[in-house]
Regions:
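Conserved N-terminal subdomain of the carbohydrate kinase-like
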Residues: 66-150
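Hydrophobic beta-strand scaffold residues
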Residues: 67, 93, 178-180, 210
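A short, aliphatic-rich alpha-helical micro-motif
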Residues: 9, 141-143, 200-203
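Glycine-rich phosphate/adenosyl-contacting loop at the front of the ribokinase-like
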Residues: 2-92, 116
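Active-site metal-binding loops of divalent metal-dependent hydrolases
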Residues: 20, 153, 182
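Catalytic-core regions built around general acid/base machinery
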Residues: 159, 163-174, 197-205
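A short helix->loop->beta-strand "cap" motif at the edges of active sites that frequently abuts
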Residues: 170-177, 246-249
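Conserved phosphate/ATP/ADP-binding segment of small-molecule kinases
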Residues: 188-249
Length: 249
C-alpha cells in the first residue's frame, strides 16, 4: 500500500476553497426553545457560518491545525461576519475577497420537526461564493499549504469553476496534495452530464476524494455507470499508481 505523504515543512496545514454561507437554526438555549415546530412558526434563530468547506476549516483549527480559506463573500454585514468569524478562530482570511456587483451570501434556514425530521430552506440567487475568479487564485499561497480542499459546489458555475480548476492545476504543479470534497447540492446544477464532466476533471487529479456512493455515481456517470465501491476504489488506486510512477525519477 502506498501512503500519501505531506510536506511537513510547509506552514499551512490545509487551504480550503469553495462555499461559505450563513446558517439560521431555530434558537435553543436557556431563554428560548424554538425546536420541533414548522419553520413558519419559528420566531427566533441562532446565526452561524455554514457551508461544507467553511465547517471543515473551523473543525481542523479546533484540532490545532493551521487553515486558510480561498473564497468570495458579499460586501455587506454578512460578509464581514464571515471574515470576523474565521479570524476569531485563527483561520487565515487573506485570500477572502468581497464581491463588487452586489452578489450576496447564501442563506440557509433549518426546519426541525422532530429529532429525526429536518429540512432546509435555502436562498442562493446571484450567490457570492460562485463569483470566485481565476485572478483570486495565487500559486504562492497554495505552495505554502500541505493540502488544498476543493469543494464540488465551486464547480457548479463560472467563474468559480475555472478558479477551482486553476487551483487544482497549481496544486499539482507545486505538489500540494489535493482533497476533493464532492459536496453535491442538487440546487446548484443544471443536469447530470455537467456534474459528471466537472467532478471527474477534479477527481482525476485528487489524492483524496470525500463523498457518498450517490456522489461517486454522479462523478462516474459519463465514465462507467453502476460502479461498486470496490471498483471505484480500484480505479483510484490505479490512478495513484500511475501518478507515483510518473513522479519517479
Amino acid at each position: 500500500m502506498k501512503y500519501i505523504e505531506f510536506d511537513e515543512s510547509r506552514p499551512m496545514d490545509l487551504v480550503l476553497l469553495g462555499r461559505v454561507a450563513i446558517d439560521f437554526n431555530p434558537a435553543y438555549n436557556d431563554q428560548v426553545k424554538e425546536e420541533f415546530k414548522p419553520l413558519k412558526k419559528v420566531h427566533m434563530f441562532e446565526k452561524f457560518v455554514g457551508g461544507s468547506p467553511a465547517n471543515i476549516a473551523v473543525g481542523v483549527t479546533k484540532h490545532g491545525l493551521k487553515a486558510g480559506f480561498i473564497g468570495k463573500v458579499s460586501d455587506d454585514q454578512f460578509g464581514e461576519y464571515v471574515v470576523d468569524y474565521f479570524d476569531e478562530r485563527g483561520i487565515d482570511t487573506s485570500q477572502i475577497t468581497k464581491c463588487t456587483n452586489g452578489e450576496k451570501l447564501g442563506l440557509t434556514f433549518t426546519e426541525m420537526l422532530s429529532p429525526k425530521e429536518s429540512s432546509i430552506l435555502m436562498y442562493r440567487n446571484r450567490i457570492a461564493d460562485l463569483q470566485l475568479h481565476v485572478d483570486d487564485i495565487h500559486e504562492d499561497y497554495i505552495k505554502n499549504a500541505k493540502a488544498i480542499l476543493i469543494s464540488g459546489t465551486a464547480l457548479a458555475e463560472s467563474p468559480s469553476r475555472e478558479a477551482a480548476i486553476k487551483a487544482v492545476m497549481l496544486a499539482k504543479k507545486v505538489n500540494t496534495k489535493i482533497i476533493f470534497d464532492i459536496d453535491y447540492r442538487e440546487y446548484n446544477w443544471k443536469n447530470a452530464d455537467e456534474i459528471s464532466i466537472y467532478y471527474s476533471i477534479v477527481a482525476k487529479e485528487a489524492d483524496i476524494i470525500m463523498g457518498s456512493r450517490e456522489e461517486f455515481d454522479l462523478t462516474e456517470k459519463l465514465i462507467k455507470e453502476g460502479m461498486t465501491d470496490e471498483e471505484s476504489a480500484a480505479t483510484g488506486r490505479q490512478k495513484m499508481q500511475r501518478s507515483l510512477s510518473s513522479n519517479t525519477v
